[in-house]
Structure formats: structure tokens, C-alpha cells
UniProtKB/Swiss-Prot annotation:
Catalytically driven reaction(s): (S)-4-amino-5-oxopentanoate = 5-aminolevulinate
Cofactor: pyridoxal 5'-phosphate
UniProt keyword Isomerase, yes or no: yes
Pathway linked to the protein: Porphyrin-containing compound metabolism; protoporphyrin-IX biosynthesis; 5-aminolevulinate from L-glutamyl-tRNA(Glu): step 2/2
Quaternary assembly: Homodimer.
PROSITE patterns, alphabetized: AA_TRANSFER_CLASS_3
EC number: 5.4.3.8
Taxonomic source organism: Staphylococcus aureus (strain JH9)
Source species taxonomy: Bacteria, Bacillati, Bacillota, Bacilli, Bacillales
Protein name: Glutamate-1-semialdehyde 2,1-aminomutase 1
Example GO molecular function: pyridoxal phosphate binding
Cellular component terms (Gene Ontology): cytoplasm
PANTHER family: GLUTAMATE-1-SEMIALDEHYDE 2,1-AMINOMUTASE, GLUTAMATE-1-SEMIALDEHYDE 2,1-AMINOMUTASE 1, CHLOROPLASTIC-RELATED
Length: 428
């Protein structure tokens, strides 16, 4: 494939934006390949400015669960645009999407719309601290919750360690109120609560980790979080920005049967437009302004375009949608295992609903340490060869692969064949 126009566009972009991008992963640095500039998408396909066609498994990093340019979403967006883009006042569209979210997400009795997943997690932590009167938050190593200061934290050497900044610009004073423990490790969490339990406001977790690849919870982990937080009077917060409506019809919490106190949402609930949300029990949510004294606001929160796209996306999802995802996922997983075995290359495949992650190691992969054992050099080679075969995968080992309702069995079979062809060139 030729990338001449993308390479020229990137040269210009690098003079205008840091690294030429507005989000780091789009620079494609971890796979050592030129950034691709996209032109348009349709269904399961995406097309770059050089005219190359790809089967798309990035799907805008998750939001496009119906694929690109879904007719129902696009039609209603045109109607909404004709009325105006934003009013700075409430619209009926906010009621419609809020009611749909409340009906489908077990933990949410009231919801507040915001404009991004980062905003949702940031506001949720402020609410948790304000509601409990405590300062510390527990997060898990390898789980990403947006780029707010208190969540850009890495683990130290101890089992339960007060956080150190993971990025310059994050004050140590803020970092010290974040405790990081290994994902899927209840013993480590218990130690954290034994040390700091009286000052832990909440535990935030991706119920399926999606930012170290795709790493589902081991049996009993989520229920263990529920039990421990309840025992200590801390809040359990599910960050379902990625898993929300991707793992199941009632999100990950419905799929796994564990109900948190607060939930963060994003991605799918905007259908491709900037949206986030957080919600939970009425008794907690009523502490948010204007009812309570915990402040939160947003100029474009609940804007009519995002509410339209979100509602028209979620309204098309049914329990049968997830049966379809499971069918496609079964075919893809079986095909990957068969092809990699054929070429004697180790692979571990993790799945949750329409999220799929593959690691180039023997496995299992249940935490960030194990995910880091993947062969990153081989992953980069695989990415480049798959792009040549017309398959657009996430350009990072630590990002998930997504399915949409627009994907077909034919797409999956072509993808499996592309892996076979790519491996034939890589493995000598």
C-alpha cells in the first residue's frame, strides 16, 4: 500500500501540533510506521486519504459499535443539526438518553452527562471524596481512567504503594492520594485497606481492563471488590467508559452481576461524538450541584448533537446484538488460534463481549505484568503486515480490538486469512 498523501499530511501536521496529532496513539510510534490520515468510513470499512481500504477494528477506539455512518444515526444527526448545534439550556434529547441509560445500567438511578470519559472519571472521584469525606482513591495497575492528575499514577515496588506521578506536571501531593495495586489481586487490595482504609473514598476499576490489551476479571475479583469496599464504607466505582454497552446489554456490571455505587460511561453512549457520563445511586448523585454542594458543570454537556447520536446508537442495541458479537468473536478467536499454531507463534486471546485482545505470549494474561511479556517487536511487525492486507488494527499492544454490528462473517474470515498471510511473511 502507498501512504504518500498521509506522509505529506503528517509533515505539515508536525509543524502545527505536538507530534502532529491530537492524541498520542495516533502517531503510530509503538509500531514504527507512518501515521495514517483517514478520509471516510462506511460500515465495517475505513478509507485513508491515499485511497486504501481497511476492515476497521479500531472503530474510533470503541465508540462506533454500529460501524461507520450508520444510516439511522446520520439521518437523525442531520435533523438535529438543522435545529442548532448547542443552546446552553436543556433539551428533551437529554431526557431521552438519560432515561435509556438509567433503564439499562443497573447501578444508575440518576445520571449527569459530560463531554468526555476523562471528565466523567474526574468528576466521579470528586463526588466520591465529597460524599465520603475521605481523600484516597485506589486504582489498579494498567487500568487507564483518563488523563486527570490523580489517575495518571503508576505503582511503586510495594504491594500496596502510595502513587508516584506517571507524567511530569502531576504534583506528588496529588499523587500521594492515589493507591495503586495489581489488577485481579484481592490480597493486595486487602493490604491497602488495612493500611489506609479509614481514608479511602473509593476504588475505581475497569471491570474489564481495556488499556493493557483486553484483560477480563478473574472469577470472584469484582465481587471481592464489592465486598471489601462495603466492609470499609468506601465507594465502588466502575469505569465503564470502554466496557459500557460493549460487554453486554446491561454493560459489564450486568454481565458479571456485580453492581457498583457509581459508574462512568463514554465512547458508545456518544455514538462517535464527544460524550461522557457518570451516575449512580440517587442518595449519592443528589450531592452534585445544583442539589448539593459538590460542583460540576460543562458548557457543552448534554449538547443536542451528542445526545442524538448517543440515543440513536443505544436504541438499536438489543440482547440479540451481543449474541451476534459472541458468534463473530468465536470465529475470530478460533481462527487466530488456528493460524498462529500453524506458524508456531504463541498467542493468548482474551475476550469480553465485542472486545478482543491478543497477546503474543504463552499466557495467561490476567494483569499488567503478564501483558508486558508480549512480544512487542513481533506485534509491530504484525501490525505493519496486517495494514498491507487491508486490516486496520489498534497500533498498540495495549489497546483493545473492537467489533461492530457492521462486521460480517466475511470480514472475519478475510481478517483470519490476512493474519495467515502476514505470518507467512514474518515467520521464516
Amino acid at each position: 500500500m502507498r501512504y504518500t498523501k498521509s506522509e505529506e499530511a503528517m509533515k505539515v501536521a508536525e509543524t502545527l501540533m505536538p507530534g502532529g496529532v491530537n492524541s498520542p496513539v495516533r502517531a503510530f510510534k509503538s509500531v514504527d510506521t507512518p501515521a495514517i490520515f483517514m478520509d471516510h468510513g462506511k460500515g465495517s470499512k475505513i478509507y485513508d486519504i491515499d485511497g486504501n481500504e481497511y476492515i476497521d477494528y479500531v472503530l474510533s477506539w470503541g465508540p462506533l459499535i454500529l460501524g461507520h455512518r450508520d444510516p439511522q444515526v446520520i439521518s437523525h444527526l442531520h435533523e438535529a443539526i438543522d435545529k442548532g448545534t448547542s443552546f446552553g439550556a436543556s433539551t428533551l434529547l437529554e431526557n431521552k438518553l438519560a432515561q435509556l441509560v438509567i433503564d439499562r445500567v443497573p447501578s444508575i438511578e440518576k445520571v449527569r452527562m459530560v463531554s468526555s470519559g476523562t471528565e466523567a472519571t474526574l468528576d466521579t472521584l470528586r463526588l466520591a471524596r465529597g460524599y465520603t469525606g475521605r481523600n484516597k482513591i485506589v486504582k489498579f495497575e494498567g487500568c487507564y481512567h483518563g488523563h486527570s492528575d490523580s489517575l495518571l499514577i503508576k505503582a511503586g515496588s510495594g504491594v500496596a504503594t502510595l502513587g508516584l506521578p506517571d507524567s511530569p506536571g502531576v504534583p506528588e501531593g496529588i499523587a500521594k492520594n492515589t493507591i495503586t495495586v495489581p489488577y485481579n489481586d484481592l490480597d493486595a487490595l486487602k493490604i491497602a485497606f488495612e493500611k489506609f482504609g479509614d481514608d479511602i473514598a473509593g476504588v475505581i476499576v475497569e471491570p474489564v481492563a481495556g488499556n493493557m490489551g483486553v484483560v477480563p476479571p478473574i472469577e470472584g475479583f469484582l465481587q471481592g471488590l464489592r465486598d471489601i469496599t462495603t466492609e470499609y464504607g468506601a465507594l465502588l466505582i466502575f469505569d465503564e467508559v470502554m466496557t459500557g454497552f460493549r460487554v453486554g446489554y446491561h454493560c459489564a456490571q450486568g454481565y458479571f452481576g456485580v453492581t457498583p455505587d457509581l459508574t462512568c460511561l463514554g465512547k458508545v453512549i456518544g455514538g462517535g461524538l464527544p460524550v461522557g457520563a457518570f451516575g449512580g445511586k440517587k442518595e449519592i448523585m443528589d450531592h452534585i450541584a445544583p442539589l448539593g454542594n459538590i460542583y460540576q458543570a460543562g458548557t457543552l454537556s448534554g449538547n443536542p448533537l451528542a445526545m442524538t447520536s448517543g440515543y440513536e446508537t443505544l436504541s438499536q442495541l438489543t440482547p440479540e446484538t451481543y449474541e451476534y458479537f459472541n458468534m463473530l468473536g468465536d470465529i475470530l478467536e478460533d481462527g487466530l488460534k488456528r493460524v498462529f499454531a500453524k506458524h508456531n507463534v504463541p498467542i493468548t486471546v482474551n475476550r469480553a463481549g465485542s472486545m478482543i485482545g491478543y497477546f503474543l505470549n504463552e499466557g495467561p494474561v490476567t494483569n499488567f505484568e503478564q501483558a508486558n511479556k508480549s512480544d512487542l517487536k513481533l506485534f509491530a511487525e504484525m501490525y505493519r503486515e496486517m495494514a498491507k492486507e487491508g486490516v486496520f488494527l489498534p497500533p498498540s499492544q495495549f489497546e483493545g480490538t473492537f467489533l461492530s454490528t457492521a462486521h460480517t462473517k466475511e470480514d472475519i474470515e478475510k481478517t483470519i486469512q490476512a493474519f495467515d498471510t502476514a505470518l507467512s511473511r514474518i515467520v521464516k
